[in-house]
Amino acid sequence: MSEQSQKMPSSIESFRSPFPYLVHEGFLDVGRCQKLIEDAELFSNSSSRREVMGGRALLPNTSSAFRDLLNSSAEWRNLEKRLNSPEFLAMLVNTLELKVHYAPTDVYTNRSGRLAPLIERCRESLQNTPLVNASSRQVGALFLLRIVHVLRRVLLGTIARLRGQVACELLYDYSRARIGYVREIHRDSDARDVVFLIYFNSTAASEGGALRLHRLTPGVQSVPRPDPDDCLLEREIVPEVGTLVAFENTAIAYHSVQMITGANTQRHFVYGAVTRLVGRNTHLHGKTRLETDWRIYT
């Protein structure tokens, strides 16, 4: 199939209700999405993916297995380069009308430099090893790795703050969801400023898996996971191949995922966020905190 025949019309729509979000149809070509799925299945071992949330397996972009995928797949290297480009960040900031000056960093995704070999050895030592079965040496490696990350986050975050910027990193994963996968109504964790999803394949509305955007009932206090009875469904976005959805993570950026019910349905997607390394997203005004689980990326 030629590149021209794979090309999809590209359009970006932005919305302010129920919270700031955008829908970018044709962000990726159909053929490119197919190749990304094929390469991910070919070059990454299923055992290297983390099973979470009952029906979703994810491969973080900070893992050794993801590094191997990048080394093996030109398509994934191209996507990685595009997502980490100044143009992609500027598109998110400008379209969502964010008033933030970001300073991109690579605390968790650094694959070069003096600390990179040490970090990779720690990750490889821990790969596919449950903590309860880990040796004292592996536990020590995990502790060292997390200390290095915290120190770098604080250092780079402080430097950026002195310059009037916010230190951030693009943290994402390749995910595959199957029958039974569902997400309750929630907002994302405190360190995430902009959340995005890229769908690699389409799923029929009758098979579930739609992204649902919700509005909080007037007068109800915002909390990270509100009671469904306190929310109104504003929009339902059925996954379409090549579509990017992104939104600002505010105190009322409530969304959920409809349960996947199709027995043979698998949804392939990227989930990620522009993640601030120090401090809390200033748009989160609710009284209840929802800490970001940094352990996913170590």
Q: Language-model segments: which ranges?
A:
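Fe(II)/2-oxoglutarate oxygenase catalytic core
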Residues: 1-298
